[in-house]
């Protein structure tokens, strides 16, 4: 799957911003057919970072949400700033 088709958009909520600051996690809405491995590869390729783990869930709206934890040597705040979240 094309990395740019896997990631649909970042999530910008109070919880998502809190996770960026406290747990070094980014939150995205992703393609419903994407696997955790697809999501990990897409994030690593697009943002040039290393991913520690990916947690996913299906929202009541039917969208797939991914919580992506970055390795400690990378900053989620930096990526969020590049995306224009701050």
From Swiss-Prot:
Signal peptide: none annotated. One of its GO terms (molecular function) is rRNA binding. Binds to 23S rRNA. One of the proteins that surrounds the polypeptide exit tunnel on the outside of the ribosome. Part of the 50S ribosomal subunit. Contacts protein L29. Coiled coil: none annotated. Belongs to the universal ribosomal protein uL23 family. HAMAP family: Ribosomal_uL23_A, Ribosomal_uL23_B. The lineage of its organism: Archaea, Methanobacteriati, Methanobacteriota, Thermococci, Thermococcales. Keywords: Ribonucleoprotein, Ribosomal protein, RNA-binding, rRNA-binding. GO terms for biological process: translation. The keyword Ribonucleoprotein applies. The keyword Signal does not apply. It comes from the Archaea. Transmembrane segments: none annotated. This is Large ribosomal subunit protein uL23. GO terms for cellular component: ribonucleoprotein complex; ribosome.
């Amino acid at each position: 799957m094309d990395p740019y088709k896997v990631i649909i958009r970042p999530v910008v909520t109070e919880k998502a911003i809190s996770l960026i600051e406290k747990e070094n996690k980014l939150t995205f809405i992703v393609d419903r057919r994407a696997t955790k491995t697809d999501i990990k590869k897409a994030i690593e390729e697009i943002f040039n970072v290393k991913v520690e783990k990916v947690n996913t869930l299906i929202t009541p709206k039917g969208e797939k949400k991914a919580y992506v934890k970055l390795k400690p040597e990378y900053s989620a705040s930096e990526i969020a700033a590049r995306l224009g979240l701050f």
